[in-house]
């Protein structure tokens, strides 16, 4: 019997059945297609043996003028800058209490009740105490004067922590621990942590119990939603924004351990935004742009307002006839989902379509043109610039932008969107794998609260592939940058906060 050479079509096709897809591939995992043939994807290794706390959903890499490489790392609990092999905690400070904190211990318990008027803390916040004295027994000064994680809040003035020694072992109070720590206790509070899961912005179940009147819409704060950071470099410095929360500035010249500070703390700060949905630096004329910023004189996010600073200034946001600060209220949709900088253009997705933002100079500074109605983003991080085009994922399909928007034919469309957890859609993110001519999107399947699947598109060969993640390949953020010799990603072990 003569031998027959079978040639299989490249790519995965799930639009039919396994039997109807004769001559093609129906399933795969951790496989890509190159020159029409399947191959195992390359391996990976740890970038550093140091670890960060929390789920990282934002990475940003850049190189300063002195050729030092930095990576900003935003998690739902902390904010770091990675230099070399070390994660430096630069989480901004929210509040400092001076000579106003007391402690109360209970015999036989490791729980300490901390009293601090209007502390503003939430569970898992970090607070560092100083100048406390012993409570009289096992809870000595060294136990108190260190950093703690808030276990739970009791009232607006009290919360609980679990006593520990300097090695992290639990300390149990005894009957002699009757003191209160003295009258000179100081406390430094980091910004409130965010959530590790997505919550709809308003409606039943959003916000805290009894925070508004019965039947009214209940907005949620940045500490009550999935923590997403956006980042960019402003020269050698790093700027960042919590989605729906604060905007911060890290001064590289002050050292890698220097905390990031609110924009409002910058010298000569003039009407700087204090809240936003996303931040970036324009590649033309070096304006800092805040999407979903609070308006001048307001203290709430305006979800369609785009504001920008004067050229090459982080502190001057007051529009005048002698500078280039300004702002525009978008008319399409109800909120900005995300923005992406491409060559000579910034794309802004609202929940109703796509707007192109371009630098035009005086007097308008930027132009805004609606280029598409309908297609949006499934999440703020689901648009990818690659191959001189922009690929993005919406709630029901994949799209391509190259001056206009077109829907991408997809041979795994039903496989992806019939089994995706839209309740956690903001965890979805996209990335570029330039060496393989691929765009990859990670997403949670229908029964998963965390990312457990991915889908890739090879734009050179026009083929799709699919796969799953596990403890060795769980990814929550991914970047490719000129300052790196390799893709850099973040992940976590199931059930872990590191």
Positions of PLM-derived features:
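N-terminal beta-propeller domains
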Residues: 1-96, 191-218, 237, 249, ...
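Small/polar beta-strand repeat architecture
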Residues: 90-227, 255-271
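Secondary-structure transition/turn motif
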Residues: 75, 84, 115-120, 161-170, ...
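Elongated alpha-helical scaffolds
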Residues: 226, 230-247
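Beta-sheet-dominated scaffold domains
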Residues: 2-8, 331-498
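Short, surface-exposed terminal/edge motifs of secreted or surface/virion proteins that either
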Residues: 70-92, 157-164, 245-262, 395, ...
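Beta-propeller fold detector
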Residues: 89-95, 258-267, 319-321, 366-371, ...
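Active-site-adjacent structural elements in enzyme catalytic domains
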Residues: 233-234, 243, 254-256, 261-287
